[in-house]
């Protein structure tokens, strides 16, 4: 696996830098942490909490699709889901598939998913009334990943999408992502067998964790304990706290057993005996803190995982903890995640602050948090998913010119060449047409060799220098760009001009609804190039 962080979930690193005030000149791309910048430079994010006192829960989804490894009654998440359904005003149809036994296929309008016990065919147009749960433990199954990808690409809401989940469950990649976003965390480094047996590399890596580490006299490294983690561990497994004097012996033993193992080594921070788990829902235009709990360590174990027996209790977050949780969740591109924060002993690490992020969880458990808040957590979360326009599609980069399909009335489809707006000046999408006529009630025109007529909509006022003029508008039922569709798109209609390369302009609002960002200098990233528009056909 490449050691570099994968930024494929962002359309550019520049957006990440701008959002989190990162000065890239101060960093190369280290294999571990450098001295962190002052954390959380950006303006404060609005803090919104889920309402835990509502009496009736609202569900807008007709179908819930669950991908799991286990249908049995022992599956606590499934148990929570079954219990949650009883409390909703609209009961969804539940479709459960075991990942190891399933497959999926699609045709022009439908996706079919099946396993040994169930088969379900869903229309692609049902993307806004279907909720998909894809737990982390099942995404490693090839057929499950294929099904999740099909649903993601068609705009279904998936908790959680594949690529952000993969980054979150790789402790090194997520640590690099936190560093890029100025999220406070323990100093860290990546350690491989090659690093360990190369003296210079080993020293360089450990120095990233403790810059003043004494390699000549280990006895002088008092209070320089290390936390060693395997990259794909979860639930507290694969985590070790070691005395600095035992570093060499422990690493030697690990690499003797598994020479290919990659480890992340972190500085042991001075915490207060537990950590805080914050569940966050990140939508297109808002974030919601769903619930939070503090997990107390038990029996001298430095870990605080509920699955290992730690005690969980309610907690009121500090303003700093709220901001850290929200920014970490936003950075991850996960619609639903749990951020684990460790409060530090006051003043124990002045370069970081009073809290550090330990990790982010793309598939958090729901049982422990349900007991703490005395509500079924699934109810609380789904109740907040009440506006399809807020569903956070995974960003994908489109070219500044793409071939699109416009669906007009009576199921008339026309392929057209569109320019995708890279600025913010356009107030409406526009369509250039031929043989334009306006009788006051209807407008008619010819496009793509087809004669069409529309009920006239409210005109749009456009500006050209100091002049203002009206443009009639129409609403088309649907447009398709790449693999994504958006319904009810308003276009301002204008007469076609000669030698025009494109005859459609999609504005920023439409692109936002599609979930695309635009590459300013590359065309046809999503679709094959069409021939230049033949104006004579208009």
Enumerate the predicted regions with their spans.
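A short glycine-rich, hydrophobically flanked beta-strand micro-motif that places a catalytic Asp/Glu
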Residues: 266-267, 275-277, 334-347
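Pepsin/retropepsin-fold aspartyl endopeptidases
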Residues: 393-538
């Amino acid at each position: 696996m490449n050691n570099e962080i994968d930024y494929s979930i962002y359309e550019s690193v520049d957006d990440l830098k701008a959002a989190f005030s990162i000065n890239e000149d101060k960093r190369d791309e280290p294999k571990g942490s450098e001295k962190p910048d002052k954390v959380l430079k950006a303006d404060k994010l609005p803090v919104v909490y889920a309402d835990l006192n509502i009496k009736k829960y609202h569900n807008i989804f007709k179908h819930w699709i669950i991908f799991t490894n286990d249908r049995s009654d022992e599956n606590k998440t499934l148990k929570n889901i079954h219990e949650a359904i009883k409390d909703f005003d609209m009961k969804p149809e539940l479709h459960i598939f075991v990942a190891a036994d399933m497959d999926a296929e699609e045709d022009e309008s439908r996706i079919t998913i099946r396993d040994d016990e169930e088969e379900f065919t869903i229309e692609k147009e049902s993307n806004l009334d279907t909720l998909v749960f894809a737990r982390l433990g099942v995404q490693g199954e090839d057929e499950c990943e294929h099904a999740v990808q099909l649903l993601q690409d068609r705009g279904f809401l998936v908790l959680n999408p594949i690529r952000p989940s993969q980054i979150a469950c790789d402790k090194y990649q997520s640590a690099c992502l936190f560093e890029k976003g100025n999220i406070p965390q323990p100093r860290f480094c990546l350690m491989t067998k090659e690093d360990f047996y190369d003296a210079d590399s080993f020293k360089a890596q450990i120095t990233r964790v403790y810059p003043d580490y004494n390699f000549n006299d280990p006895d002088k490294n008092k209070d320089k304990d290390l936390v060693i983690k395997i990259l794909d561990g979860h639930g507290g497994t694969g985590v070790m706290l070691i005395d600095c004097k035992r570093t060499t012996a422990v690493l030697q033993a690990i690499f003797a057993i598994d020479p290919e193992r990659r480890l992340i080594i972190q500085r042991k921070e001075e915490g207060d005996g537990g950590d805080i788990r914050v569940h966050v829902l990140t939508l297109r235009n808002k974030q919601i803190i769903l619930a939070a709990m503090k997990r107390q360590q038990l029996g001298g174990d430095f870990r605080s995982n509920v699955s290992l027996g730690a005690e969980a209790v309610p907690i009121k977050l500090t303003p700093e903890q709220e901001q850290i949780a929200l920014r970490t969740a936003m950075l991850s591109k996960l619609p639903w995640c749990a951020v684990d924060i460790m409060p530090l002993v006051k003043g124990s690490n002045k370069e970081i602050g009073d809290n550090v992020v330990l990790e982010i969880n793309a598939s958090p458990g729901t049982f422990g948090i349900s007991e703490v808040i005395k509500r079924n957590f699934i109810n609380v979360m789904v109740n907040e998913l009440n506006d399809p326009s807020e569903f956070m599609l995974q960003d994908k980069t489109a070219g500044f010119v793409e071939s699109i399909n416009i669906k007009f009335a009576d199921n008339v489809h026309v392929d057209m060449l569109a320019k995708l707006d890279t600025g913010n000046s356009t107030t409406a999408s526009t369509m250039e047409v031929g043989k334009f006529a306006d009788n006051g009630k209807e407008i008619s025109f010819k496009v793509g060799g087809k004669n069409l007529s529309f009920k006239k909509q409210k005109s749009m006022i456009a500006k050209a220098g100091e002049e203002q003029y009206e443009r009639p508008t129409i609403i088309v039922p649907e447009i398709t760009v790449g693999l994504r569709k958006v319904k009810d798109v308003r276009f301002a209609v204008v007469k076609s001009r000669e030698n025009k390369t494109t005859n459609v302009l999609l504005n920023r609002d439409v692109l936002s609804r599609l979930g695309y960002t635009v590459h300013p200098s590359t065309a046809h990233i999503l679709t094959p190039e069409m021939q230049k528009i033949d104006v004579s056909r208009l």
